[in-house]
Amino acid sequence: MRAWIFFLLCLAGKALAAPQQEALPDETEVVEETVAEVPVGANPVQVEVGEFDDGAEEAEEEVVAENPCQNHHCKHGKVCELDENNSPMCVCQDPTSCPAPIGEFEKVCSNDNKTFDSSCHFFATKCTLEGTKKGHKLHLDYIGPCKYIPPCLDSELTEFPLRMRDWLKNVLVTLYERDENNNLLTEKQKLRVKKIHENEKRLEAGDHPVELLARDFEKNYNMYIFPVHWQFGQLDQHPIDGYLSHTELAPLRAPLIPMEHCTTRFFQTCDLDNDKYIALDEWAGCFGIKEQDIDKDLVI
């Protein structure tokens, strides 16, 4: 369970970068986008340059003018280059130009069961296959080297949301405890989580049996309503439209699969109308939230 919390803390940034909106995959298709890019804040080290301020600004302007690619965004697998008119354009990255992996944790597994040294190597390779049938079918399945993922049994599927709900609640509480000046949560979110944090009946984080998790959900149902809505809002970013595509699910799904083999099947069953998107009511219903308690105003 602690490992679960670690992963979502790494993914809790609001900017879950995904360059395009894609529907949920069919049962044989998996996530294309993965790990989100957390927005970089201001440099905490502020250097006073005094009379050199103007010169520094001029130098910065010159650098920007000489490098049109500096603020030109390219999606995963592509890099910026200048054309004959000195205009920025995105081209496929050479996989051999990707940084050498530091360790096993950087490796990723594709849906054709091939391990890539890093997500950079995967997306660069996929880009070179753009326009081909193979490239269209190639997707990133999960984070980590390829391994055997056992099928998800019906009995196991019913247990998945029990752990997931408890995890979401614990992640929010952890973010609240660590927030202070880190801006991990908005003020509105803090007010909601504060009530959960101060509730004496709250089940502390731990590796609890599913029977205990089920009883706690029944007894302390109200504690779980906001965490489920909060996670939906964290994922619904590209665009913010009240629906989750498989691209938007990727930052949550990809790290979970090696630990929770029912992840893919769970998200597939959430799509009740099979339109390849998960709406808020479908998402909340998957976690046992009652229809009368589903409120888009809680997605804050």
UniProtKB/Swiss-Prot annotation:
Chain residues that bind Ca(2+): 271, 273, 275, 277, 282
Key words, A-Z: Basement membrane, Calcium, Copper, Disulfide bond, Extracellular matrix, Glycoprotein, Metal-binding, Secreted, Signal
Residues covered by the Follistatin-like domain: 68-90
Signal sequence region: 1-17
Entries under InterPro entries matching the protein: EF-hand-dom_pair, EF_Hand_1_Ca_BS, Fol_N, Follistatin/Osteonectin_EGF, Kazal_dom, Kazal_dom_sf, Osteonectin_CS, SPARC/Testican_Ca-bd-dom
Gene3D superfamilies: 3.30.60.30, EF-hand
Sites carrying sugar chains: 113
Main location: secreted
EF-hand domain: residues covered: 258-293
Disulfide bonding pattern of the chain: 69-80, 74-90, 92-127, 98-120, 109-146, 152-262, 270-286
Entry GO CC: basement membrane; extracellular space
Single GO BP term: semicircular canal morphogenesis
Localization terms from the record: Secreted, Extracellular space, Extracellular matrix, Basement membrane
Superkingdom as given in the UniProt entry: Eukaryota
Family label: Belongs to the SPARC family.
Chain's role: Appears to regulate cell growth through interactions with the extracellular matrix and cytokines. Binds calcium and copper, several types of collagen, albumin, thrombospondin, PDGF and cell membranes. There are two calcium binding sites; an acidic domain that binds 5 to 8 Ca(2+) with a low affinity and an EF-hand loop that binds a Ca(2+) ion with a high affinity.
Protein name: SPARC
Species this chain originates from: Sus scrofa
